């Protein structure tokens, strides 16, 4: 697991669930906590009930990764790999690459990638709705 791989280097992961419990209950916070516990994911898990964090960060998908340096500056945003539904077929490891490059003291080659996953479930909208200004990042 990526979080375990980088833990010894001081990297910490935090999951934030911004999905509306009213739109798609399968992805609500409690359901995802159950999944977190089942798979023993090694990170803190927070709930963005108001969806203000998702709006502030511009979150489009779940998951949508954000990497911050020690100065809390955003240095990477986007996907983990290019085939999240089938890990063995991946050809790109964007999140791992970004972390390795940063920890080696190098500039991140691709600091912006398109997140891949289900859309954030917005309160008061149907489950596949996306904001009108949402688009691919690159």
Please give the residue ranges for each predicted region.
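Extracytoplasmic/periplasmic, Sec-exported soluble proteins
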Residues: 24, 57, 87-91
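Short secondary-structure boundary/hinge segments and terminal tails
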Residues: 24, 54, 72, 119-120
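Residue-level detector of short coil/turn "hinge" positions at structural boundaries
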Residues: 13, 43, 61, 108-109
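Structural microenvironment flanking redox-active thiols in thiol-disulfide oxidoreductases
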Residues: 1-38, 49-54
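Non-globular targeting/processing and membrane-anchoring segments
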Residues: 8, 79-138
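Flexible, glycine-rich phosphate/dinucleotide-binding loops
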Residues: 22, 74, 83-84
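Short, internal strand/loop/helix patches
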Residues: 32-69, 74-75
């Amino acid at each position: 697991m990526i979080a375990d791989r980088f833990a010894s280097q001081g990297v910490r992961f935090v999951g934030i669930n911004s999905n509306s419990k009213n739109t798609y209950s399968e992805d609500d916070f409690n359901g995802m906590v159950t999944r977190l516990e089942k798979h023993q994911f090694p990170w803190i898990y927070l709930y963005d009930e108001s969806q203000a964090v998702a709006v502030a960060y511009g979150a489009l998908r779940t998951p949508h990764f954000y990497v911050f340096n020690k100065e809390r500056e955003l240095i990477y945003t986007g996907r983990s790999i290019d085939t999240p539904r089938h890990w063995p077929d991946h050809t790109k490891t964007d999140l791992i690459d970004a972390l390795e490059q940063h920890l080696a003291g190098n500039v991140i080659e691709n600091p912006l990638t398109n997140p891949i996953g289900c859309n954030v479930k917005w309160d008061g909208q149907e489950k596949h709705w996306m904001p009108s200004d949402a688009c691919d990042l690159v």
